[in-house]
Amino acid sequence: MPPNLLLLKRWLVGAGIIIVLLLLFREELPAVTDLRGRQVDRDGFVSRTEMMAVVREWQKRERIRKIVGLVFYHKRQQAAILDCYLKRDLAKNGGVLDQVIWLRQTDDARDVEFLDKLVRSEAHYSWRNQEGSDGSAYDGIQDDLLYIQIDSGIVYMEDGTILSMAHTRAMRPDFYLVSANVVNQPLSSWLHLSLGAVKPYLPDNETWAPVEAESGVMNWRPSRLPSWRGPPDFDVAKWNPPADRQHLWLPVTGKTDHLLHNTPIVHTVYDAYKDQGRWKWMAAAQQHYSLLENLERGELSKYKFHLWNYQELGMGTQLVAMTGKDINAAKPIGAAAERHFAVTMPRKIGRPAVADGRRVAAYYSSKDQSEGLGQTDILERYRSFAQEHVCKGRMLWTRNADHV
């Protein structure tokens, strides 16, 4: 047989096999119209419209009357930032929150005064005192509500974060608790490091924070910062911040390998209960600057995943969704409420605590990070970002407010 005919024969046999396989398995290949009907966004996740429809249908089916934000209020400096995000997420503004309850957990006079101002600024806000132990925060919880528990230290929420959490809870009744994808939590810090979201940053005592000359407002963009300059053998463990002012963390540039070498994040471990000492606040600083850089570059996709089951290892509860029925079934709730919800109850009832990785949020500071982070300009950078991109009108508190 001539070579050309032999090649043609082989080609026809191969094409025939492919056609047969396509016919056999055609039911598993979705049509273009099927893909279009799923309403996926550019990241490949379900669209906002479809998520909202699923949540509303779930509410009707399960008789969930409202979706309520339950905010654990501590400090006005952070809560003023969160306020902008919560107002954006109110149902009347296209979000899912029907109301927000601010739970006062401070006796500081200026914080209490600001809370009153905050609640008066929005008809769908209310507040109440917490009496007694941590468990008393859950007095008055109603079975037929979905609660979004929020720490007032949440200083960034990607648009659709709360909706995404509610959607996951609606789709997966086998989940006990659904968290957002939160930057600066013990286990998620290791996860974000592993996903490649954390950038190389090191502290600097010489450079002053950039401020816009006309407005006097800090520019949140890390691209405005100079590169970090220091000796190759710089030991961040022996470094101390300046005593008289805030300091910056600067991007380490010009390296092509070992990018994170000698930066605090490399000390992060997948263990929520291991004491990391001063590494904990320094790793937080590096993560916050990294998030701001990724926001500026439009690269939040670096953080994302669908679901992550923490396997009872101690997930943070700074931004979580729980039904009132599930909260009430967990009573009595003692002083260690976070561990009770994230570890004890999932272990007891066999329903896991998971993170919804489709939207990103940021938690500013735990108690053992607050002193160190308070010596940085990070909070003001988040304030500047929110004022520019989220707030409708001027933020209710700025750093000059206490000096008026």
Residue ranges and their predicted role:
Residues 98-102, 117, 122, 182, ...:
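Long, low-complexity intrinsically disordered regions enriched in Ser/Thr/Pro/Gly
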Residues 62-67, 90-101:
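Short loop->beta transition adjacent to catalytic acidic/histidine clusters or analogous donor-positioning motifs
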Residues 101-149, 155-163:
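Active-site-proximal specificity loops/subdomain of glycosyltransferases
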Residues 68-76:
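A conserved hydrophobic helix/loop-capping motif in glycosyltransferases and polysaccharide synthases
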